[in-house]
Amino acid sequence: MTTAEAAAPESRTFEADVAKLLHLMVHSVYSDKDVFLRELISNAADACEKLRYEAITTPALLGEDARPRITLAIDAEGGRLTVEDNGIGMSRDEMVEALGTIARSGTKAFMERIEAAAGGEKAELIGQFGVGFYSAFMVAEKVDVISRRAGADTANIWSSDGKGAYTVGEIDVAQAPARGTRVVLHLNEDGKAYADRFRIERIVKEQSGHVPVPIYIVEKLDAEPEEIADGVALWTKSKSDISAEDYADFYRSVAGQFDQPALTVHFRAEGRHEYTALVFVPSTKPFDLFEPERTGRVKLYVKRVFITDDAELLPRYLRFVRGVVDSADLPLNLSREMLQDSAILAAIRKGVTGRVLTELEKLAQSDAEAYAGIWSNFGAVLKEGLYEDYERRAQLLNLARFKTTTSGTAADTGWRTLKDYVADLKENQTAIYYITGDLARVEHAPQLEGFRARGVEVLLLPDQVDSFWVTAGVDYEGKPFKSVTQGAADLSLIPLPKSDEAETPEPEAKDTGDFIAFVKETLGDQVADVRASDRLTTSAVCLVAPESGIDRRLEKLLASAGRLGDAAKPVLEINPRHPLVAALAAHGASDSNFRADAAHLLLDQARVLDGDQPSDPQAFAERLMRVMQRGLPTA
């Protein structure tokens, strides 16, 4: 494109210390050069909105070109990129006012005038500050702005290299748009990478694809413009006008996934803060769900212009949710990448979080199978909220689903809720019992035997986060959570079925007491205590944490992360009714070496059952060999 020489163009200097401000903006305010295009498109969309508003009272301004549009023209050979709109345009004085002063935005002044005239009713305009336009100098060594105001007979050109001065003057209307503004970027060496159709189209679709004006691209001189954005944002439509397939297509585009959404949440919040949210729960688990740096993937828009996907619009325990939130009244500071009013953002975060959880509750009640699929994929993440979000803990507990000793662990078996669990409490049961660890192991843990024998249901908690949230003072309907691997089992008030009580004879109390005392003395400081167990029915031994200690699995997790000093000594529980223990107790003290070997082997057996190894494999092997030899006939 060429521009006519302006007759006696007037040279001016910017009213602010532009060189310093431009340097700060280019090198500090914007962390991503791509935003220049977003800013220019936003300005163009504002110009179209201004024209629409003024045409309400002056329809002749539209002429024969009533449909708004934004056109991007690429001149790779000439190293130029042009952004043109058919909006309201600018007069010479408006150019000087809007472009000659940093941080004096024509859009902001226009909004103030509109609000004053309309009693505070807001016009839907994007720009709030006057520096967005100047982001063009990140990629351009010179910028020409050619504009013809709607209804005017003259056109003007503004030119600057962004170094402190600019020129402004009249231009032949034949060299200007029929109406609106044309911004011509003479790209610098780094900026020439933007004279590329695919790069421009990608940026438009990522950041400006939902502005309320169609966007076209012209790749070559005299080529027909191609539409690359239709000016429609799906979330602005009424839900009744959107099909399930429309939602699914939008989900795939915004989430970058190929599955169907398991849950769609679309709502508009009105009141003190107005915003629209359209978010989705995926039906498949993202591969990076548990990456340490994984954050939310909800995109923040302001008036349909993409701002960031790093605004933490949802808590970390909802980081699997994808979608968009669009605010019409969220203020922005100098850069649209930095949010100015955290109080508004906090209100949006609270509202969207609450609505997502409420919709999950509704789905759980109306379609248990569909909700079970969501829980299977994301339950381990949702449970992080039980530890982190005290305010919503009760709601999250109602959303939680569990495999238990009653339900079984197979994938196709049902899930249990805490409401189900509490409804089935046994007589005299005062706690909600749980065990943490890998399902394949804990399902057969010896610590469960006494609970199973009494029909007491135990939650099976396989995820690492389970070891943390259960220690956070959580209760449900007044019932505390209690680990079956910590402290005393307290099962004496929950009787065994009559048949089980009759099957196992009581051992001699004195023999058992003497043997337990011997084992405790023999093991010394390897254990905190040795005691008779009321939680074991078929196994001989098990390990539990002391009452004042921490859960065994949590202790292992902290130790593996280097966040635990000296580990607490475990308690060894011995089943006095087990035939092996009864035989050892009745053996007497005549062969102390044999009984000492047996005591150590019982501890090592308990360690193995707990998923550990013998503390001294060499000593374990020697003791095992001696005990086996003792049972063989002498040659």
Swiss-Prot record:
**Which intervals of the chain are annotated as region C?**
557-635
**What Gene Ontology molecular function terms does this protein carry?**
ATP binding; ATP hydrolysis activity; ATP-dependent protein folding chaperone; unfolded protein binding
Where can this protein be found?
A: Cytoplasm
Q: Where is this region: B?
A: 337-556
Give the record's GO CC terms: cytoplasm
Q: Does the keyword ATP-binding apply?
A: yes
- Classification via InterPro entries: HATPase_C_sf, Heat_shock_protein_90_CS, HSP90_C, Hsp90_fam, Hsp90_N, Ribosomal_Su5_D2-typ_SF
**Which residue stretches belong to region A?**
1-336
Query: Which Pfam families would you find in this protein's record?
Result: HATPase_c_3, HSP90
Q: Which family does it belong to?
A: Belongs to the heat shock protein 90 family.
The record describes the protein's role as: Molecular chaperone. Has ATPase activity.
Q: How does it assemble?
A: Homodimer.
| Name the record gives this protein | Chaperone protein HtpG
Say which species the protein is native to: Azorhizobium caulinodans (strain ATCC 43989 / DSM 5975 / JCM 20966 / LMG 6465 / NBRC 14845 / NCIMB 13405 / ORS 571)
